[in-house]
Amino acid sequence: MKDTKKYNESRQLPKGGYLHKDRVEPESSAGAPSISSMSENKENNGNKYNGRLLEKILEPANLNLAYKKVKANKGSSGVDGITVEDLLEFLKQNGQRIRQSILKGTYRPSPVQRVEIPKPDGKSRMLVIPTVLDRVIQQVIAQILSPLFEEKFSEHSYGFRPKRSAKQAVLKCREYIQTGYTWTVDIDLAKYFDTVNHDRLIRRLSKTAKDSRVISLVRKYLVSGVMINGVVTETQKGTSQGGNLSPLLANIVLDELDTELERRGLCFVRYADDCNIYVKSRKAADRVMASITRFIEDKLRLKVNKQKSTVDRPWKLKFLGFSFYHKNQKIGIRVHPESIKRFKQRLKWITARSNAASMTHRMLKLKQLITGWVNYYGIADMKKLAQSLDEWLRRRIRMCYWKQWKKIRTRYKNLVKRGIDKSKAWEFANTRKGYWRIAGSPILTRTFTNEDLRKLGLQSIMMRYSLVH
């Protein structure tokens, strides 16, 4: 097992501050072309840099942008213990040496730290945490390579790409269904990020990234290893789910699937490793499922999860948290029941009686959650759902207030304070009804009207939905 000190020593090169204030470039380079302007240059390709792609990656402007993105994303420290807050000072002292090390090909990435993230189905997803330094280096690579591949990627691919989103993917699905493609081949890849074949990935990468030093650096990241309980294990396949390069590498591998589906003239939508193919009959769907499964497993050397992959009507399936419905010969988008269930679970946690947080803090957390959720699912038709969720959530909030008041005398004082007649307030304060029942009774619906709750800071789901739909 390698220790942290050795990792740092292997990465550090001549001293010489490379950073100034909160920049990774010296002030004299502040006017260098930005990476965003490059991404719109249609002439970008691997040959453009004449074998000096690595120098382009390590340009000061690109390094500055990567540093700022990593800093903004925050996140935990990796195996070396360096935090995002420590990063600026670390790069000031070692940035130039690290840059030279990468150019010479002597830089060695650190192993990643593995963590388990619970999934809704009770299982867990393995994510990895690279060191903050390796996040910056992966980010600078991704910022230059992404524009080179963007012009090659399929129009049917929507995941982890600039100016593309899950919303666009779902709208495209509806378009296919509306035009008669009412059978779905839902392909589920088993542990995709853990099973990517390195050799196939490197070959596809090399066709566009015409610099062997860049290819070598990417391969080093693929095989950098995983640290579990202090022991480093080699990685012979897969790409780290959680690394800054992973989304791009995932799209590079699955672009081969996109090309094959386009060659066959199929209607499909892919978002990262979620792929739905649309056809007009059950027979065609079964045939496509069998042939595409063979292609994925034999050609791409990936594994199809046959238990989760299925052929069915689109309104019976879930895609990116959405589903569909048909009414009056029109296809609509709805939030899938599982997505609603998970949302309510998160709302329940914030409004749990056992939660000791203040009501002000709860209101803030609810606003953040509701805003994010509605912004994502706002393309769905969910007016009735939003109204129903609002009623349920208001009742939960009333329950929280009642629980916080606890004692009879406290309840009495607060009821009177909120305008309830003293005799009624005393009667209400002495009730033996349970919390949930009280929350739906006139005792609290009169004490906390909908308008009262709005003034107290409760974000209305329906109001938020009306702004985005």
Residue map of PLM features:
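Non-catalytic, polymerase-adjacent accessory regions of viral genome-replication enzymes
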Residues: 1-92
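A conserved non-catalytic segment of reverse transcriptases
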Residues: 223, 299-371
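Conserved nucleotidyltransferase catalytic core and NTase-mimicking acidic/glycine-rich helix/loop elements
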Residues: 19, 23, 378-433
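Amphipathic alpha-helical blocks
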Residues: 86-109
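Glycine-rich active-site/cofactor-binding loop and its immediate structural neighborhood
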Residues: 121-130, 134-139
